[in-house]
Amino acid sequence: MTVFQLDDFLAGWIGGASSVIVGHPLDTVKTRLQAGKGYKNTFHCVVTIYKKENVIGFFKGLSFPLASITLYNSMVFGFFSNTQRLISKYRYGDGRHPCSMLDLTVASMLTGLVSVGVGAPVDLVKIRLQMQTQPVLAENFNLAGNGSVPLRSMGIQSQSFYRGPLHCISTVLQNEGIQGLYRGAGAMILRDIPGYALYFIPYTLFCNWLNPDDNSSPPPCCIWLAGGLAGSISWVTATPSDVVKSRLQADAMHQRKYKGILHCIMQSYRTEGIHVFFRGATVNAIRGFPMCATMFLGYELSLQFFRSF
C-alpha cells in the first residue's frame, strides 16, 4: 500500500459536491446574519430573505461553491488522509498503522493551514455574491461614514454589483489586487487550524465509539451520525473567528470599514457587544449537521466503492 493515494481526493470531491447542495441555503442565512444588518434572529433572517428574494435568495452564489468547494474538499480530505498515512509511515513504519491522538491533531491542523490557500478566495467570492442585497449595500456605506449619501446618487441601483463568480473575481483583482482575494485569510487560519482538529478528531472518536469493531468499516448510519455531530461541534466552536472572517471578506464591496483582524474585532465589539461573535452559531449548528453528515457519508462510501475494485 503506497502512502500517496489519489482516490482520497476523488472521494473528497464527491463528498464536497453533495454537502454544498445540502448546506448552501443555511450558509446564505449564516453569512447574512454575521456580515449583514437588520436581522433580529435566524427565523427573521430566513423570512426576510424569502419575502424579498423568494427561494432563489437562499441559493445566491451556489454555482461558484459547487464548482470550487468540491475542489476545496477534495484537497482537504486528500491532504488529511495522505498526511495521516505519511505520519504513520514515518513514526511506525507502516502507513496503515492507526494514528494516535497526537497524529490526528497534527494532520488535521496542517490540513487547516494548507486549506486556506484554496479556501480563502472561494469563501470571499461566495460571501460577496451572497451579500448582494440593497440593505447590505446601504449598511456598507453607513458604516463607512457615508450615511447621508443615497445609493442611487452613487450609481448603485437595486441590481447586483457582481454579475457572477468570474465577474466578482475580476472586479476584486482590478480594485483590490491579488491580496483582495485573500482578505480575511488571517481570520480563516485562526478558524480552520483548530477547526479542523475539532472536525476530524471528533469524527474519528464518534466512529470508533459507534462501531467498536476495528475489523469492519462503520455502517452508513454511523458515518452519517458521526459526521453530523463532528460538523456541528466544529462549526459552533469556530463561530467567533467565522464572524470576523465573514465581515472582513464582505468588507470593501464599496468602501472599507475594517483595517484588519484586530480592528474588526474591536469595532464589532464596540458597536454590537460580545454577543456579535456568536451571531450565526445556531445556524452553524443546524447547518453543520446535515452538511457534514452528507460530506463524510459521500466521502466514505465513494472511498469504499473505489477500493472495491
UniProtKB/Swiss-Prot annotation:
Chief localization: mitochondrion
Keyword annotations of the record: Membrane, Mitochondrion, Mitochondrion inner membrane, Repeat, Transmembrane, Transmembrane helix, Transport
Annotated transmembrane regions: 9-29, 61-81, 105-125, 186-206, 218-238, 281-299
InterPro entries hit by this protein: Mit_carrier, Mitochondrial_Carrier, Mitochondrial_sb/sol_carrier, Mt_carrier_dom_sf
Gene3D superfamilies the record matches: Mitochondrial carrier domain
One annotated Gene Ontology cellular component of this protein: mitochondrial inner membrane
Superkingdom to which the source organism belongs: Eukaryota
Coiled coil region boundaries: none
Compartment(s) of residence: Mitochondrion inner membrane
Solcar repeats: 3-86, 99-209, 218-305
Family matches, as PROSITE patterns: SOLCAR
Topological relation to the membrane, as annotated: Multi-pass membrane protein
Family: Belongs to the mitochondrial carrier (TC 2.A.29) family.
Protein name stated in the entry: Solute carrier family 25 member 48
Protein's organism: Danio rerio (Zebrafish)
